[in-house]
């Protein structure tokens, strides 16, 4: 049985709330809510991993060496390794947002207060990352590459495509079938349900997960998903690392790291992480 957790509360005040939702090798995920003037990070760089931000409410300013991006609601920002960056809440309202680090690279321990092993450094004298590689993508079909676009039935949009992480958006009509049960040998699969509910099939059990649920499936665990509900459902899908998932959806990566369920049933689904995002 997959149980829905609530994550690990790191800090909770009216001005700033930080909850660690996922802390596995392939991904660290933090949900945060911050008032203007709080949650500000200094300019920094990650040498070996990428960072992504999604804004639910309010706005963030993503500062790079040569420009500033305003990240509003329903928008992703993706920062590759070696790119100097910082972010802070902008405007007059609180911001609610999700922070991903892929791979984890010690971020879980970092937010707990142990920074020694985390892959983060002050900006070098000569930065090597090109700030033009930073991606900012609005969701809901507004931006990105639509792989499938049948509004009443199914829309699949690639938002971020990088070695460290692929982020896609799935919008499925009532009763629309998703992926049949399968496994990934060498990478993790994840979902964040945004609207409605998706049914996730994990080994021999099925679980309907509502909006606001984050699910991370480690390598070797059998899983699939459908929209079994009578309403539209929308989610983000993550592959960590990418392994060419976007090309797989385009039909140009037949060797993608995806296999039918093994005869032994795959690995124990107890390692699956399911967390409800805080309001």
Predicted segments, located by residue:
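Short acidic-glycine-tyrosine-enriched beta hairpin
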Residues: 66-81, 204-222
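Structural motif
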Residues: 52, 59-61, 68, 84, ...
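Short strand-connecting beta-turns/loops that link adjacent beta-strands
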Residues: 25-26, 48, 92-93, 164, ...
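Asparagine-centered strand-capping/turn motif at beta-strand->loop junctions
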Residues: 88-90, 226-229
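A short hydrophobic beta-strand segment most commonly corresponding to one strand
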Residues: 78, 92-109, 216, 230-247
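Short, conserved beta-strand element in jelly-roll/cupin
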Residues: 31-35, 45-63, 100-102, 169-173, ...
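A short, N-terminal "cap"/entry segment at the start of jelly-roll beta-barrel domains
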Residues: 1-28, 36, 42, 112-166, ...
């Amino acid at each position: 049985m997959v149980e829905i957790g609530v994550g690990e509360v790191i800090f909770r005040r009216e001005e700033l709330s930080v909850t660690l939702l996922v802390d596995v090798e392939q991904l660290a995920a933090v949900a945060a809510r911050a008032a203007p003037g709080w949650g500000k990070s200094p300019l920094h760089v990650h040498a070996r991993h990428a960072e992504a931000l999604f804004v639910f409410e309010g706005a963030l300013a993503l500062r790079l060496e040569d420009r500033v991006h305003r990240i509003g609601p329903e928008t992703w920002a993706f920062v590759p390794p070696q790119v100097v960056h910082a972010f802070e809440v902008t405007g007059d309202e609180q911001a609610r947002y999700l922070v991903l680090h892929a791979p984890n690279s010690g971020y879980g321990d970092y937010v707990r207060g142990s920074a020694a092993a985390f892959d983060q450094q002050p900006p070098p004298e000569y930065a090597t990352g090109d700030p033009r590689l930073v991606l900012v993508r609005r969701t809901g079909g507004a931006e990105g590459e639509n792989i499938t676009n049948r509004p009443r039935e199914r829309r699949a949009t690639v938002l971020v495509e990088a070695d460290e992480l692929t982020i896609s958006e799935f919008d499925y009509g009532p009763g629309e079938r998703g992926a049949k049960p399968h496994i990934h040998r060498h990478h993790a699969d994840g979902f964040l349900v945004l609207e409605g509910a998706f049914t996730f099939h994990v080994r021999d059990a099925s679980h309907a997960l509502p909006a606001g649920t984050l699910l991370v499936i480690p390598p070797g665990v059998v899983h699939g998903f459908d929209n079994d509900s009578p309403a539209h459902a929308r989610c983000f899908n993550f592959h960590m690392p990418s392994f060419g998932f976007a090309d797989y959806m385009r039909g140009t990566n037949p060797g993608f790291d995806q296999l039918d369920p093994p005869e032994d049933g795959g690995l124990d689904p107890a390692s699956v992480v399911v967390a409800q995002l805080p309001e």
